[in-house]
Amino acid sequence: EVIEVFAYSCNHCFNFETNIELFEKTKAQYIDFKRMPVVFNEAYKMHARMFYTAESLGILDVMHIKIFKAFHLDRKQMMTESEIFELFSEQGISKDQFENRFKSFTVESKVNRAERLTRKYKIRSTPTIVVNGKYTSNGPSTRTFEDIIAVTRELALKEYSSK
């Protein structure tokens, strides 16, 4: 399992997106790739709620990059429910659909799980890659985005080979 831990408000994560998309398309079949929004505090919870709401509505593929662009190109803060809904409404999502998912037990549970895993994996910065719950991409061998991807592939192969 390979998890990309990211934050929509993180400029490095936005810049890393091209690399991680390429990784996702070219990863080995044995790699189960997932994304997880980091949850450091209440502001990050709101951002995680956006991710899991988009996922539950089946529009994450479209919304993921749109949310990044809203932060980094349009300079939106995305801190209020109404501002977030505005972005979702551009995809044809009604206010009722949005509110039912945004405040749902399922979305809240996933946000809480992301918060627990943020602590468990000792995430201090983003983007961070977690391989099999054991290894993270922080350290002297990962100075560039390409290094992060290379180390991720090596660690995933190591874990797969040790089974």
Language-model segments: which ranges?
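C-terminal cap of thioredoxin/glutaredoxin-like
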Residues: 90-163
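Structural alpha/beta surface segment adjacent to cysteine/selenocysteine redox centers
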Residues: 3, 8-86, 154-159
